[in-house]
Amino acid sequence: MEVVYLNSARNCFRYIIKAFGIKEIYIPYYLCSCMRHVAFAEGCKINFYHINLDFSPVPTFPENAYILYPNYFGICSKIVEKLVKIYPNLIVDNAHSFYAEQSGIASFNSLRKFFSHIRDGALLYINKKVSFDIDKDEYTYVPKTLNYGEICQNERRIDNLDMKFMSWTTYKLFKDTDLDFEKAKRKSVFQNFEKIYNDTNCLDFTLNVEDVPFCYPYLAKSEEDADKLVENLKNNGITIYRYWDRIPDSYNESIFYRRLVAMPFC
């Protein structure tokens, strides 16, 4: 596997499309819209697919199809393990699972999703050696934890990033990060959430021993219960984000938009 240091996860996806010359791809409805925008921009035909309530894909795909599958909230490594044995052209979006093993023909993560002092950057693992004429990102910044407004501003900046190699600032911050410490901290916080919320969580999932989730995903019994929990968390200084854009209520996945509370490890 080649490791490529790029400036964002979405540009990792762009790199993959270019590297393999992908013209058609399967993408789930339940996913950040930036990924479909990348595919559209690169001229890919997109076939959208549904997922079940355990996050596994509903359909059976053509054997040699290119498939983008997200490791949702970092709790879906067992599903990834099954898919990679069936589909030779699986692409794994590990934006929510930095510590996951490389899988499929390519997989990528997102530094800023896991390390609050890092603003951008992503690692791409790809089984094809290619050479693109791209520049190194020159973005520089002072590392600090961002408030909500600054996070939104940074998101808008990332939306407009050209595909470039990771900036020196981001690379240095990443290399100076104690990955073992961050891993242990996340697992500890996740376990604390488990003790409090597992009995009432409508999501049924079992982690692999090495899984390090992005957050604690809590599926409330009703939309009203979810709203109450979000309000309570906000009153305690915890910002909760919706994942992702609203989708039609007739879709299975709409339950996640309406009732899933992604509790951050802050």
List each language-model region with its residue ranges.
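PLP-dependent aminotransferase-like
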Residues: E2-V3, N11-K85, N89
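Hydrophobic transmembrane helix bundles of membrane-integrated enzymes that assemble
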Residues: R10, T60-F61, S77, E81, ...
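Generic structural signal for small/hydrophobic residues in well-ordered secondary structure
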Residues: C12, I25, N71, D93, ...
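Short, polar loop motifs at secondary-structure junctions
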Residues: Y30-C34, G74-I75, D93-E101, K129, ...
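PLP-dependent aminotransferase class I/II
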Residues: L31, H50-I51, L68, I134-C266
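Short loop/helix-cap segments at secondary-structure boundaries that form the rim of catalytic
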Residues: R36-A41, V58-E63, I79-I86, F98-I105, ...
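Active-site PLP-lysine loop of aminotransferase-like
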Residues: F73, F108-D120, K128-Y141, C266
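Conserved active-site segment immediately N-terminal to the catalytic lysine
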Residues: N89-Y125
